[in-house]
């Protein structure tokens, strides 16, 4: 039997690299007088991939931004919270400098500086952590502390956090060990009182105990597929001492704990300083004075607090800050919706009074920056529903009355005779 190509010639083709014939492989790719089979292509890909892995750590070593550069990058995406940005910039820089130079410097062992972010909802805690990970080009994952339980109980094991991080970097252990983990709602795992409980608290103090070693640094055995359902599979060994943990929470009521401590320490009698009610510190001012003893009273155990030596407090966003958030960051909400409307070939304009109205509504809801999107979405819903079916619309204008629900957006048409209001 004669082997023939589709073009009718009787020549049998062979891979120029491994020598296999066209019938021994699935695919043979032709070049100028040379051929390569699919098996050799796969082998080349594997070789290149391994070389990239070896080169990547050297590239990362030379790419560590300074605290000033980190702060400038955060300014592009996060409005306000200047002190928190400075604290985060220094802590993150020191953490990755420690990784780059090893755990010791001149015989001195460098400790790990995990971070605790304290601030009201919608103040930018999650956004700060996400922006840092994006700047440093490291794997990033978020975990909700309220879903975690002690091992052996219904809920997520704390090791599942590391498993999620591995998923983000395609189970590359070396890459995962340079990652950032953000644990949200950390205040929700506080114990019910500051006295040790005689009953088992599997979702509060129990989770704090389970997180201790993970945050401080241990070699966690993580199943590649996660969970507790595959006990026989080979486990991945991940050194968590190289992972930066950032914990965040609103800590509602912590300001009262701090106020009680501050007022108690102010003294009584003839030498005491008498303060008028108007002199009472704001929530942000009180949170900036937080001490470990306040967090213990709130319900965090001392050992857990000790693993989070860097504390940054975030202030509640003012109306002016919310207006800035709407229009100034690189991925500002108004810019996102304008880009969305541009895909339909329509310009979207937010007038200044509309931005003021959005900020006022968000302040009234006490949801911070998180509530801005829902307000804008509600105002634009009908327009986004109708716009794809409409013709000749060139521009949509949003003013204060639209945000307040008193009128519909103004639609400006391309043809002057067809110009009309959406009312």
Swiss-Prot record:
InterPro entries, alphabetized: AAA+_ATPase, ATP-dep_Clp_protease_ClpX, ATPase_AAA_core, Clp_ATPase_C, Clp_protease_ATP-bd_su_ClpX, ClpX_bact, P-loop_NTPase, Znf_CppX_C4
Ligase is among the record's keywords: no
UniProt-listed PROSITE patterns: CLPX_ZB
Cross-referenced HAMAP family: ClpX (MF_00175)
Function: ATP-dependent specificity component of the Clp protease. It directs the protease to specific substrates. Can perform chaperone functions in the absence of ClpP.
NCBIfam families: clpX, PRK05342.1
PANTHER family: ATP-DEPENDENT CLP PROTEASE ATP-BINDING SUBUNIT CLPX-LIKE, MITOCHONDRIAL, ATP-DEPENDENT CLP PROTEASE ATP-BINDING SUBUNIT CLPX-LIKE, MITOCHONDRIAL-RELATED
Name of the protein in question: ATP-dependent Clp protease ATP-binding subunit ClpX
Organism in which the protein naturally occurs: Salmonella arizonae (strain ATCC BAA-731 / CDC346-86 / RSK2980)
Record lineage: Bacteria, Pseudomonadati, Pseudomonadota, Gammaproteobacteria, Enterobacterales
């Amino acid at each position: 039997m004669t082997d023939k190509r589709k073009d009718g010639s009787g020549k049998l083709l062979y891979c120029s690299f491994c020598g296999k014939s066209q019938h021994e492989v699935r695919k043979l790719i032709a070049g100028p007088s040379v051929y390569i089979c699919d098996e050799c292509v796969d082998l080349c890909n594997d070789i290149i991939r391994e070389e990239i892995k070896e080169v990547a750590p050297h590239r990362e070593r030379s790419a560590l931004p300074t605290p000033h550069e980190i702060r400038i990058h955060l300014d592009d995406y996060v409005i306000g919270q200047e002190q928190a940005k400075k604290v985060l910039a220094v802590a993150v820089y020191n953490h990755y400098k420690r990784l780059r130079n090893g755990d010791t410097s001149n015989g001195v062992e460098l400790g790990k500086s995990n971070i605790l972010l304290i601030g009201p909802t919608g103040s930018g805690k999650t956004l700060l952590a996400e922006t840092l990970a994006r700047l440093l080009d490291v794997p990033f994952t978020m975990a909700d502390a309220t879903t975690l339980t002690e091992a052996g109980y219904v809920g997520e094991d704390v090791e599942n956090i590391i498993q999620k991080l591995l998923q983000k970097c395609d189970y590359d252990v070396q890459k995962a060990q340079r990652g950032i983990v953000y644990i949200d709602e950390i205040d929700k795992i506080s114990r019910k009182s500051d006295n040790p409980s005689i009953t088992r608290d599997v979702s509060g103090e129990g989770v704090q105990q389970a997180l201790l070693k993970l945050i401080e640094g241990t070699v966690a055995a993580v199943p590649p597929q996660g969970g507790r359902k595959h006990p026989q599979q080979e486990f991945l060994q991940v050194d968590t001492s190289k992972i930066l943990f950032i914990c965040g929470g609103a800590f509602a009521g912590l300001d009262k704990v701090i106020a009680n401590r501050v007022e108690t320490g102010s003294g009584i009698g003839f030498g005491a300083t008498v303060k008028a009610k108007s002199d009472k510190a704001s929530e942000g001012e009180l949170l900036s004075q937080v001490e470990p003893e306040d967090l213990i009273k709130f319900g965090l155990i001392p050992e857990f607090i000790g693993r989070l030596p860097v504390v940054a407090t975030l202030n509640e966003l003012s109306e002016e800050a919310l207006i800035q958030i709407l229009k100034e960051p690189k991925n500002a909400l108004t810019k996102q919706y304008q880009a969305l409307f541009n895909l339909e070939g329509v310009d979207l304009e937010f007038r200044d009074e509309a931005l003021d109205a959005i900020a006022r509504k968000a302040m009234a809801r006490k949801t911070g920056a998180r509530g801005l999107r829902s307000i804008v979405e509600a105002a634009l819903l009908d327009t986004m529903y109708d716009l794809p079916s409409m013709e000749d619309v060139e521009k949509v204008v949003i003013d204060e009355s639209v945000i307040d629900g008193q009128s519909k957006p103004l639609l400006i048409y391309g043809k002057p005779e067809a110009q009309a209001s959406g009312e």
